[in-house]
């Protein structure tokens, strides 16, 4: 049996899947609503895997892959979708993971984003971070925010991504999108150049290293609105991660810079729905939201990040919310199960406290 890569992609989209995995010695796998599922029982050979993977690559990409054994790129099927592609080697054969990217940028209502996220998109300057594990919808949240700016403001938007996922057609804004490996050698190089390209809005697809983080903070300090992502699971952890990247002799200065430039942190995760309706997306987003107030700015400046959680707890009137509060509310509304709520928190006792008497007895699933 011979597979065509575009047939597998179409089947993935038809089934509402998010990821396609190709590996020698296994059938293709789809991730649907967070769960991996083998597709059929035909085992892919190493040659079949390589043929499927190489059919998505141009000559330059093939040469890069043969030299480095790893590759990030994107691939589009007209009329279907675009895909983020990562190719790697395992047990001597090529394997790949393809993430389906919607060609339509979802709006705030469809994503279920709180109004405060929209409000933060309207800020003229500062640093806004969307954080969470891989596959938590960070890029989608950022896309909704950038799309709102594009539709409502005459700005120059510059993005640096690896790879470009959502394509923005200029509406009110001028939009330039740069892809790592095709348009720039590194995030840091692109950010250095960006400051000479008259941007109003800068999106950094991933703040991976000290130089990129330092440049993003500096750009926010100098009057730009900067969006970025980190693989952190909470607002306080995000602050610590940024500070810890720098050597100890620079950390005091960076705390001051961050306290002055940071606007908001949205730390998010996707939680399986309890009873999704037919055709409905099987996961729901849960966000911890930290808005920088003078009090939180002082906590960052003074290195008292352990107190940030309490500040978020008391900041509900400003639009702030802890992840635990959101999970508890979703459980009480019947949107998610108790097990799902507990699996997404590092503070299970807090979730249990917020759920209160509605929590199931020990050993009982709900």
What are these regions (language model features)?
Residues 1-366:
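Short, flexible helix-loop junctions that flank or precede catalytic/ligand sites
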């Amino acid at each position: 049996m011979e597979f065509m890569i575009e047939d597998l992609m179409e089947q993935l989209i038809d089934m509402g899947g998010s990821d396609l995995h190709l590996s020698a010695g296994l059938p293709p796998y789809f991730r649907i609503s967070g769960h991996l599922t083998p597709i059929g029982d035909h085992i892919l050979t190493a040659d079949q895997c390589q043929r499927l993977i190489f059919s998505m690559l141009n000559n330059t990409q093939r040469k890069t892959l043969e030299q480095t054994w790893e590759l990030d790129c994107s691939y589009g099927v007209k009329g279907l979708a675009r895909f983020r592609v990562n190719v790697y080697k395992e047990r001597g054969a090529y394997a790949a993971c393809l993430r389906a990217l919607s060609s339509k940028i979802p709006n705030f209502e469809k994503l279920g984003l709180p109004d405060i996220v929209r409000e933060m998109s309207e800020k003229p300057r500062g640093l806004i971070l969307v954080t969470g594990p891989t596959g938590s919808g960070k890029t989608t949240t950022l896309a909704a925010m950038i799309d709102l700016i594009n539709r409502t403001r005459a700005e120059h938007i510059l993005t640096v991504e690896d790879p470009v996922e959502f394509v923005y057609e200029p509406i009110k804004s001028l939009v330039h999108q740069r892809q790592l490996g095709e348009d720039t050698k590194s995030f840091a190089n692109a950010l250095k150049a960006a400051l000479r390209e008259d941007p109003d809005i800068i999106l950094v697809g991933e703040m991976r290293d000290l130089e990129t983080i330092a440049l993003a903070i500096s750009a926010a300090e100098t009057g730009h609105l900067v969006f970025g992502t980190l693989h952190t699971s909470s607002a306080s952890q995000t602050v610590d991660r940024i500070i810890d990247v720098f050597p100890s002799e620079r950390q005091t200065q960076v705390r001051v810079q961050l306290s002055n430039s940071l606007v908001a942190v949205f730390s998010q995760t996707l939680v399986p729905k309890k009873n999704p309706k037919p055709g409905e997306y099987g996961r729901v987003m849960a966000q911890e939201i930290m808005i920088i107030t003078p009090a939180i700015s002082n906590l960052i400046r003074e290195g008292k990040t352990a107190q940030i959680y309490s500040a978020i707890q008391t900041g509900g009137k400003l639009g702030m919310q802890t992840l635990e509060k959101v999970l508890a509310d979703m459980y009480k509304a019947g949107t998610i199960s108790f097990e799902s709520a507990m699996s997404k928190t590092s503070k299970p006792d807090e979730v249990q406290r917020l759920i209160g008497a509605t929590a199931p007895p020990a050993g009982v699933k709900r």
